[in-house]
Amino acid sequence: MNYYDYLSPIKQKKRVFISFHMDDLHAKTLLIEQAKSDKFDLEFINYALNEPFETKWKTQCEGRINQASVTICLIGRQTYSREAVIWELNKSYELGKKVFGIVIYRKEQNYWPQPLITYKSPVYYWDIPTIVNALNSP
């Protein structure tokens, strides 16, 4: 065994921007709590904003999306129709961020926000190992 075998790789926190409809705040909270589990190699630095959708919000939001490496869109019943979610996703693509969706309600009809379709982003069912793999893939 050489010197380098003793060095463990330095893990960086994943800076994740979570785009969601406020009706699905419970899902955002659950995702962040599940990410804290020692069972999974997953950490979030939460950059989501919960303020009115206006110019000031957009400026702050763009800064936070820019600081993140990934945008996750939590797809609930009405996510597809939310102006702020669509703006966040389009801004994420514009800034060159990795973007993917997570379906919150597996047994219900879920419509995806148009940017996820337009940019052919992957969408997964809620499953932490799958989310971890998606975050760690190139």
Regions found by a protein language model. Name each.
Residues 19, 73-76, 102-103:
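Conserved beta-strand segments of the P-loop GTPase G domain that flank and frequently precede/overlap
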Residues 78, 99-109:
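Short beta-alpha junction loops
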Residues 50-73, 77-94, 136-138:
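TIR-domain catalytic/interaction hotspot
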